[in-house]
C-alpha cells in the first residue's frame, strides 16, 4: 500500500512539473517544491565547494575511470551506451562496470559482485533490473554494485585487476576521481524543464556541464535536425571544448520468451526474425524512465502498436500486472506482447507461462546503440 501511494505521489508530481498548476492546491505544492529546490541547490554548492577547496578529496585507483552520467533525472539512455563501451573497450582491456544498483537489495555502502564475467552470482532482486540485464548481455565483463563507488573501484582493481572501470551514472558522484566524464543528453527532453530537483528534473545546475569531456545526445533519430542543433548550441554555451556525439538506437534482434514443457525448469529464449514485426499488431509493455523511445523503436521496426502499458521506471511486476496485460490483449484480440530486456529479466517462469496458457506470444525487442561523431569514442577513450 505504501508503495502504491508513493507511485501515485510521484506520478502526480511529475505531471504537475511538466504541465503546470491547475488548482490552488497545485500552486501551493509548486511553491513548496521551489523552496526545496533552493535548499537542494545550496547543498550542491556546498558539496562542490568542499571538493574544490580540497577539504574533501576524491579517492583514486590505478585503473582509468570512465563515467557515463547525465544531468537530468530519469532515463536518458545511459545503459545502452555503457554496454556499447564495455564491449568495445573489453576488446583490448580488462574492463569492469560499476553501478549503484538502483532499487536493488545490494544497493548499499559495501560493494557486491553481480557477475565475475563468466557467471552471474546474484538474482535480479539483489542486483537490480538494469545491472542484471547488463550482466546477461556482457559476457566477459565483471559487474559490481555499491553506493560507494570508490570502495567498488578498489574491489574491481583488487579482484579483477581492472584496467578500465566504467562508472554507470557517475557524473554527480564525486567520491571517485574520473579520467573521462561522458554526459548523456536526452534528445527528447534535454534540460529537465530548466529547474532543479524537486521543482524540475535537473540533478545540478547546467553550469555543471563544463566538467564534461564528451556529450552524447541520445535518441537523435527521434528529433528534427533543427532541434538537434538547438541542443548542441545550448551545450556549446556551457562547454565549448567537449566533443558532441549523436546516439541512435536500432532494433537488432527479437526474442520469444517461452518455458520448458512439463517441469518448466528454465526460461527459453527463442530468436525470431525481426521481419515478424512488420505489420504485426502488438501491445507494448515497459517500465522505463522514457517509454516513448521504446514505442518509437517498435514503430520504426514496422510493428503496429495498438496499445501501450507504461509502468514506472524499475517497476517490480506483480501477478495483477500480468493479469492486466493479458486481459488487455484478449480484449483487443492481440496475440503478441512485446517488452524490453530490462523488463524481461523480472518475469518469472510462472509469469511467462500465463501468456502461453492464453496463446499470447511474449517477445523481447533487443536494441543497440550507434554513435555518430568525428572519431570513434571508444578509440579516443583508449588513448586517455
UniProtKB/Swiss-Prot annotation:
Keywords: ATP-binding, Kinase, Lipid A biosynthesis, Lipid biosynthesis, Lipid metabolism, Nucleotide-binding, Transferase. GO terms for biological process: lipid A biosynthetic process; lipopolysaccharide core region biosynthetic process. Gene3D superfamilies: P-loop containing nucleotide triphosphate hydrolases (3.40.50.300). GO terms for cellular component: plasma membrane. SUPFAM superfamilies: P-loop containing nucleoside triphosphate hydrolases. ATP binds at residues 72-79. Pathway: Glycolipid biosynthesis; lipid IV(A) biosynthesis; lipid IV(A) from (3R)-3-hydroxytetradecanoyl-[acyl-carrier-protein] and UDP-N-acetyl-alpha-D-glucosamine: step 6/6. GO terms for molecular function: ATP binding; tetraacyldisaccharide 4'-kinase activity. Its EC number is 2.7.1.130. It catalyses: a lipid A disaccharide + ATP = a lipid IVA + ADP + H(+). HAMAP family: LpxK (MF_00409). PANTHER family: TETRAACYLDISACCHARIDE 4'-KINASE (PTHR42724), TETRAACYLDISACCHARIDE 4'-KINASE, MITOCHONDRIAL-RELATED (PTHR42724:SF1). This is Tetraacyldisaccharide 4'-kinase.
Amino acid at each position: 500500500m505504501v508503495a502504491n501511494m508513493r507511485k501515485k505521489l510521484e506520478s502526480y508530481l511529475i505531471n504537475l512539473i511538466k504541465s503546470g498548476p491547475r488548482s490552488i492546491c497545485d500552486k501551493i505544492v509548486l511553491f513548496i517544491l521551489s523552496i526545496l529546490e533552493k535548499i537542494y541547490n545550496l547543498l550542491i554548492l556546498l558539496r562542490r565547494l568542499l571538493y574544490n577547496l580540497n577539504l574533501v578529496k576524491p579517492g583514486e585507483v590505478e585503473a582509468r575511470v570512465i563515467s557515463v552520467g547525465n544531468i537530468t533525472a530519469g532515463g536518458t539512455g545511459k545503459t545502452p551506451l555503457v554496454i556499447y563501451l564495455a564491449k568495445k573497450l573489453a576488446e583490448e582491456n580488462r574492463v569492469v562496470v560499476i553501478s549503484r544498483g538502483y532499487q536493488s537489495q545490494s544497493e548499499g555502502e559495501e560493494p557486491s559482485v553481480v557477475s565475475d564475467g563468466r557467471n552471474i552470482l546474484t538474482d535480479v532482486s539483489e542486483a537490480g533490473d538494469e545491472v542484471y540485464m547488463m550482466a546477461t548481455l556482457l559476457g566477459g565483463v565483471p559487474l559490481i554494485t555499491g553506493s560507494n563507488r570508490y570502495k567498488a573501484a578498489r574491489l574491481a582493481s583488487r579482484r579483477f585487476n581492472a584496467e578500465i572501470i566504467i562508472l554507470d551514472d557517475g557524473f554527480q558522484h564525486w567520491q571517485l576521481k574520473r579520467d573521462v566524464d561522458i554526459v548523456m543528453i536526452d534528445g527528447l527532453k534535454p534540460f529537465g524543464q530548466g529547474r532543479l530537483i524537486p521543482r524540475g528534473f535537473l540533478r545540478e545546475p547546467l553550469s555543471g556541464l563544463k566538467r564534461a569531456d564528451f556529450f552524447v545526445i541520445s535518441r537523435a533519430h527521434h528529433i528534427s535536425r533543427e532541434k538537434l542543433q538547438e541542443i548542441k548550441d545550448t551545450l556549446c554555451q556551457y562547454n565549448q571544448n567537449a566533443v558532441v556525439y549523436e546516439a541512435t538506437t536500432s532494433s537488432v534482434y527479437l526474442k520469444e520468451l517461452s518455458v520448458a514443457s512439463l517441469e518448466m525448469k528454465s526460461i527459453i529464449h527463442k530468436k525470431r526474425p525481426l521481419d515478424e514485426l512488420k505489420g504485426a499488431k502488438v501491445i507494448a509493455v515497459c517500465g522505463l524512465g522514457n517509454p516513448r523511445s521504446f514505442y518509437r523503436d517498435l514503430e520504426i521496426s514496422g510493428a503496429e502498436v495498438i496499445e501501450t502499458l507504461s509502468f514506472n521506471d524499475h517497476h517490480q511486476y506483480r501477478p495483477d500486472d500480468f493479469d492486466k496485460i493479458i486481459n488487455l490483449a484478449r480484449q483487443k484480440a492481440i496475440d503478441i506482447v512485446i517488452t524490453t530486456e530490462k523488463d524481461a529479466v523480472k518475469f518469472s517462469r510462472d509469469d511467462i507461462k500465463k501468456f502461453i496458457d492464453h496463446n499470447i506470444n511474449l517477445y523481447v525487442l533487443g536494441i543497440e546503440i550507434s554513435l555518430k561523431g568525428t572519431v570513434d569514442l571508444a578509440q579516443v577513450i583508449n588513448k586517455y
